[in-house]
């Protein structure tokens, strides 16, 4: 990890995982296009239970956490909302974990480790295409966000959960792995780059920033996203890496709401959370009136 002495931010960099790059690139996982409920028995013994990942969870009730569905929202607007929530959490104005679920209009973002040298087309071309480039403080390289990609930004107090950054990243991978398994897609980790992969094709990405124990930014799962803009960059800063989507692996479009529902269920299971829906307007009210707790709406 890198540390910014000015802002006390810790940024995630790739680490060693349990799958070697050679094994990942040479494997050809089978794809089950049948019943979405079908699970791959190869993963039946996989540990995605937070009670076994962290034994302290076995005797604790699930942590209360707000789930906010933002729909399709401009990247900079969502980024500002995240930093506002993180600031409120650091100051003690908000004491509850919050996860933002959303999609972005087309945008390229540059992480701490990825610059414009990984852009394979001219910036003039991107301007003509109407796609902005935004530099952010998350870990990782250049990436693309767009409609059809499910993004989750968990703004979580890692210290309160007694979970380290490496385990938290592994948990986000578990969430995506279990989600795509629901539709019979076998994905796996890659020791060269965090996220989830189908062979040499990346299906889900992770980029985090941590400020005083509070996480922000998060995961991006390619569901029905247009993959063409990914060909205009070197994803993850790696040559010969391609992106894939659940739609491409299955040969059919998926309802985003269904995928989002499963992702929420996996957040609850993996991180031992009790997600309760609240609205964007209620969240804004709490940021403006810190003594007012946003009302819980119907379940997620």
Explain the meaning of each model-derived region.
Residues 41, 55, 143, 212-214:
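Short glycine/serine/proline-enriched coil/turn segments at secondary-structure junctions
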Residues 198-252:
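Catalytic cores of processing enzymes, dominated by hydrolases/peptidases
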Residues 2-3, 15, 228-300:
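C-terminal accessory segment of soluble enzyme catalytic cores
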Residues 1-28, 32-33, 60-197, 202-203, ...:
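N-terminal lobe of the biotin/lipoate ligase/transferase fold
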Residues 148, 215, 259:
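Catalytic-loop motifs flanking and including active-site residues across diverse enzymes
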Residues 26-28, 35-63:
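Arg/Gly-rich low-complexity intrinsically disordered repeat tracts
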């Amino acid at each position: 990890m890198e540390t910014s002495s000015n802002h006390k931010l810790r940024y995630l960099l790739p680490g060693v995982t349990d799958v070697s790059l050679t094994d990942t690139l040479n494997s050809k996982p089978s794809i089950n296009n049948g019943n979405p409920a079908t699970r791959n028995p190869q993963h039946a013994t996989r540990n995605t239970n937070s009670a076994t990942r962290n034994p302290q969870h076995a005797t604790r009730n699930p942590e209360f956490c707000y789930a906010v569905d933002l729909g399709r929202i401009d990247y900079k607007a969502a980024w500002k909302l995240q930093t506002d929530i993180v600031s409120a959490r650091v100051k003690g104005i908000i004491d509850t974990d919050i996860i933002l679920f959303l999609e972005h209009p087309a945008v390229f973002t540059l992480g701490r480790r990825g610059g414009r040298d990984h852009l394979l087309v001219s910036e003039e071309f991107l301007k003509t295409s109407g796609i902005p480039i935004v530099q952010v403080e998350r870990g990782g390289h250049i990436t693309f966000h767009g409609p059809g990609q499910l993004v989750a930004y968990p703004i979580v107090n890692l210290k309160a959960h007694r979970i380290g950054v490496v385990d938290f990243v592994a948990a986000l991978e578990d969430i995506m792995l279990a989600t795509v398994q629901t539709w019979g897609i076998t994905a796996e980790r890659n020791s060269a780059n965090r996220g989830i992969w189908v062979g040499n094709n990346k299906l889900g990405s992770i980029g985090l920033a941590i400020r005083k124990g509070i996480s922000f930014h998060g995961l991006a799962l390619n569901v029905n996203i247009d993959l063409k803009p990914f060909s205009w960059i070197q994803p993850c800063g790696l040559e010969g890496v391609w992106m894939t989507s659940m739609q491409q692996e299955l040969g059919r479009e998926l309802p985003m709401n269904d995928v989002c529902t499963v992702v929420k269920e996996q957040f609850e299971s993996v991180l031992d959370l009790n997600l309760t829906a609240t609205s964007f307007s209620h969240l804004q009210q709490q940021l403006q009136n810190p003594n007012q707790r946003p009302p819980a709406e119907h379940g997620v």
